[in-house]
Amino acid sequence: PKIKEEIFFLPDTSYFFQNATIEDMADFYSAYYPRYDRKRMTKLLGKISLDSKRKISTFSKGMKRQAGLILGICAGTRYLFCDETFDGLDPVMRQAAKSLLAYEVANRTFTPIIASHNLRELEDTCDHVGLLHKGGVLLSKDVEEMKENMHKVQCVIPDARDEEALLAELQVLQYEKRLSLLTMVV
């Protein structure tokens, strides 16, 4: 279907064909994504010194991440679904990846959807965050609003009835109890 031309998925564990090079993967993606931009790919790879003719299997985890992100961006899709995008990248490459995504958002119709367990990592990249829990949307807010209105609270409440009353009274997003220590995100 036509809609698949608008979506690229970048999984947590990058998958590339056995013995494939970045060029091989670009050939593959070009067949499915009519707006695949090889010139842009060559330019981006040159900026980070990744050899498009080297076997991807010889790359480090971070290099594979970079290759996957560049392949995904150059597919020219409207949406890029990313799972743990910045995992495995050193701090310099992490910032470069964030800058690349920001550039794409600013210069074309492009929306990255980034799944991460590290909310702090997303606060300077995303303007909207959704929290998923047990298959549902627990929360959907602007990052700034969320930072202003969310708090982590730790306390000890000796009486279980007081604990139940407190939990019923607050909007608790996350709750954990270890021995007598109660930790909540409200």
Model-derived features: positions:
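ABC transporter nucleotide-binding domain
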Residues: A97-V185
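ABC transporter nucleotide-binding domains
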Residues: P1-I114, L119-H133
